[in-house]
Amino acid sequence: MFSRVFVRAASNAAKAGVKPPVKLFGVEGTYASALFTAASKETSVESASSSLVKLSSLIKEDAKLKHIMENPALSTKDRAVVVDSLVKSSANLDKPVVNLLKVLAENNKLGLFDKISSQFSILNDAHNGLIRGSVTTAQPLDSKNFKRLEKALQQSSLVGQQKTLKLDNVVKPDIKGGLIVEVGDQTIDLSVSSKIQKLNKVLEETI
């Protein structure tokens, strides 16, 4: 029942020209995108985001609740009880978010809530003109180099006009050196490990 209601709301919003600002992938991305379109039509993106943050905080603070939500063996009845408990514990939740919880309970996907919430935050950032990006390096970048790179990316076509870049430094020693830049759904791989892989491929093809 709630699956149909949730999907119908998202579908109506899509027909009205409401589309997520960035394309997400995977099951979590699909749910997050559907919530974005439904919230845009019925309430607001800000309201949905606020409710998700509230619920995420509640779940994070209750280890037992988190464990229960991630239990795939939970019965349909018990999943419904969990949702009712969440709704009662969090006053004035956004309606599309409540419908999302019920859909997740129906489909035994409550364990995906945290990931869906995380994916929705990406949509919310983009909706507010904030583009997320990351630069992966073998060792942490010092503040000076990080700011120089952030400024260069902010002014590049990867970010675009009237957008603000939110850049994080991800450390992965296995890339050996160089860096990997990811902005939105675009990736620039300048890592040493990537160059080694390309060299190995060339060598294999010539042998």
UniProtKB/Swiss-Prot annotation:
Q: Which SUPFAM superfamilies match?
A: N-terminal domain of the delta subunit of the F1F0-ATP synthase
Q: Which domain of life is it from?
A: Eukaryota
Instruction: Give the primary localization class.
Output: mitochondrion
Any one Gene Ontology molecular-function term assigned to this protein's record: proton-transporting ATP synthase activity, rotational mechanism
**Where does this polypeptide localize?**
Mitochondrion; Mitochondrion inner membrane
Annotated Gene Ontology cellular component terms: mitochondrial inner membrane; proton-transporting ATP synthase complex
Keyword annotations: ATP synthesis, Hydrogen ion transport, Ion transport, Membrane, Mitochondrion, Mitochondrion inner membrane, Transit peptide, Transport
Task: Give the family this protein belongs to, as stated in its UniProt record.
Answer: Belongs to the ATPase delta chain family.
The record's subunit annotation is:
F-type ATPases have 2 components, CF(1) - the catalytic core - and CF(0) - the membrane proton channel. CF(1) has five subunits: alpha(3), beta(3), gamma(1), delta(1), epsilon(1). CF(0) has three main subunits: a, b and c.
Biological role: Mitochondrial membrane ATP synthase (F(1)F(0) ATP synthase or Complex V) produces ATP from ADP in the presence of a proton gradient across the membrane which is generated by electron transport complexes of the respiratory chain. F-type ATPases consist of two structural domains, F(1) - containing the extramembraneous catalytic core and F(0) - containing the membrane proton channel, linked together by a central stalk and a peripheral stalk. During catalysis, ATP synthesis in the catalytic domain of F(1) is coupled via a rotary mechanism of the central stalk subunits to proton translocation.
Recorded protein name is ATP synthase subunit 5, mitochondrial
Q: Which organism is it from?
A: Candida glabrata (strain ATCC 2001 / BCRC 20586 / JCM 3761 / NBRC 0622 / NRRL Y-65 / CBS 138) (Yeast)
